[in-house]
Amino acid sequence: ETLVYTEENLWEYIDGAAENFISFDFKSVAVQDYAAAGGAAGAGGVERAGLKVEAYEHASPLMAYGIYAQMRNADLPPLEIGNDAFSDGYSIHFWKGRYYVRVGVYEERPELAEAMKSFAAVVASKIDDPGALPAEIERGPGHAHQVLAHQGQRRRRPRPVAAPSHRG
């Protein structure tokens, strides 16, 4: 079963990070668990050797790049999946077009790392967007950072502030 979350209910899935995703013109995320070959989904999700795919759609490639750039660990080598990708052992993160995608496993094992990489490549191939770098990124990281910062400030929702107490 594919679960879909939108801006209105994203906090139900990623409570602490929802605001950050929304600030990058988040539209929706589709979440799907896959059981390992020969395995069955158990209570509370797939068996421990399964895969989970999260495909976050944003309003533009620049916004998808923005959230990906926040997740990107520069110490990890790039992978040739989508526009850019990396693996932290438990997940492969990539962005392509308007999508930031995370493919994850529940155990860090060499055979799962290869399966995860193959699965992520298949997911990337299914994204019809050609995945060209946004012009803001091609102009340089400084320009992209300025545009992303402006977009993030524009999208952030003000938090309610308690009225000051007047004691006298």
Question: Would you name each region that the model predicts?
Answer:
Residues E1-G168:
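Soluble, non-membrane globular domain cores that form compact, hydrophobic packing
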